[in-house]
């Protein structure tokens, strides 16, 4: 496609720019509506008989111009510039200073302090908070988002459910440039602000505590969740700790089929199933010296079964999280996440997103390793 240069000479427009202009024109004319998926790089290469490198350049130009949003594993979608009006453009309707908070659940061992911190930050900034719990269900998470959007919230703080698939409704919010901050569980590869813990480093340090004590036959224990980022990061940190000692973690010792700590499968029925699984595992693997549990409640199940079998020894279980202590010592050596900081920073990031300010994409809150014998004196 030739066009006139500055002095009237003809110059050839690069193929990638021709493709870029064509798709941009289609977006502006409504051929591709906001939120609609556009052809992939491979499709464009076939359509225009060009290399994938050429089509990739065109897609990059569209993304850099904020005309499309690229979601790994999902495709590229037309960004909706009109879907979200910033607070300063809104009138003062009741919903304009509401923040939607969606958690998959919370307990004394985790998330209560996050929630309190978000609430305090909302009050400090003159916002109100509306809370919904998804109970670990993608459908309930979607319903909560729809309900709160209809209620008029101007942004979301979301603890995504444990699932290998990302919630399509959250991805739609991203495409629409609706302010969203995720906490605890990161949507890797998706351009969404995140506040949480460096689970790889925390797990690596916690496992190193056991290895330093001389333990080698260590069982990694996690729920039977899908390949969620948080759990996979903790598993990876566990493996890295072994590598630090020139060792390889024995996956035959791992327990990864428990489900009673997941929100959608809580209850006595599932708890008894998990106890039976652990009991059998202990009988089959008498060589296990210690356990690294990815969650506090899994550590409680392990302790119960070990005591029942007469095999429990002090400090043979480490875990993530634990109830806040008051004049007492920790039941297990564990990772204490910076919940209050996570809550405060998630609100700060959300407000920056709402007002269109520059903000970091990822914030890692500090954590601590609390030894079993340490006391919290308030």
Which residue stretches match the model-derived regions?
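Extreme N-terminal segment that seeds HTH/winged-HTH DNA-binding domains in transcriptional regulators
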Residues: 1-47, 85-91
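Periplasmic-binding protein-like
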Residues: 100, 153-160, 219-222, 285-295, ...
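Hydrophobic alpha-helical segments within soluble ligand-binding/sensing domains
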Residues: 193-220, 240, 271-279, 337-355
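N-terminal helix-turn-helix
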Residues: 36-70
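An alpha-beta-alpha
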Residues: 206-247, 359-376
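Flexible loop/hinge segments that line or gate small-molecule binding clefts
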Residues: 159-205, 321-332
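Amphipathic helical "hinge" segments at domain boundaries
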Residues: 17, 84-154
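Flexible loop/turn connectors
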Residues: 22, 279-378
């Amino acid at each position: 496609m030739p066009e006139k240069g500055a002095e009237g000479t003809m110059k050839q427009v690069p193929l990638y720019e021709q493709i870029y202009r064509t798709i941009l024109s289609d977006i502006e004319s409504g051929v591709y509506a906001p939120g609609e998926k556009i052809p992939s790089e491979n499709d464009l290469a076939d359509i225009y008989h060009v290399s994938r490198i050429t089509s990739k350049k065109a897609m990059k130009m569209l993304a850099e111009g904020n005309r499309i949003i690229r979601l790994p594993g999902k495709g590229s979608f037309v960004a909706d510039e009109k879907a979200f009006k910033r607070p300063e453009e809104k009138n003062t309707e009741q919903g304009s200073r509401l923040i939607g908070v969606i958690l998959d659940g919370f307990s004394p061992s985790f998330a209560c302090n996050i929630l309190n911190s978000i609430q305090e930050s909302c009050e400090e900034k003159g916002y109100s908070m509306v809370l919904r719990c998804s109970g670990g269900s993608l459908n309930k998470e979607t319903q909560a988002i729809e309900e709160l959007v209809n209620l008029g919230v101007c942004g979301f703080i979301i603890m995504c459910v444990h699932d290998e698939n990302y919630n399509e409704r959250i991805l739609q919010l991203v495409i629409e440039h609706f302010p969203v901050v995720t906490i605890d569980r990161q949507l890797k590869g998706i351009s969404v602000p995140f506040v949480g813990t460096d689970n790889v480093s925390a797990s690596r340090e916690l496992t190193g505590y056991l290895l330093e004590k001389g333990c080698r036959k260590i069982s990694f224990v996690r729920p039977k969740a899908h390949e969620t980022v948080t759990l996979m990061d903790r598993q990876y940190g566990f493996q890295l700790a072994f590598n630090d000692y020139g060792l390889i973690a024995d996956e035959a010792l791992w327990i990864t089929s428990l489900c009673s700590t997941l929100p959608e499968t809580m209850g006595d029925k599932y708890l008894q199933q998990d106890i039976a699984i652990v009991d059998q595992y202990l009988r089959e693997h008498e060589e296990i010296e210690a356990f690294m549990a990815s969650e506090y409640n899994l550590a409680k199940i392990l302790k119960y079964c070990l005591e029942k079998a007469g095999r429990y020894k002090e400090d043979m279980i480490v875990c993530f999280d634990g109830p806040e202590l008051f004049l007492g010592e920790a039941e297990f050596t564990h990772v204490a996440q910076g919940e209050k900081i996570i809550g405060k920073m998630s609100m700060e990031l959300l407000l920056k997103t709402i007002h269109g300010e520059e903000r970091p994409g990822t914030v890692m809150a500090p954590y601590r390793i609390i030894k079993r014998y340490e006391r919290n004196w308030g």
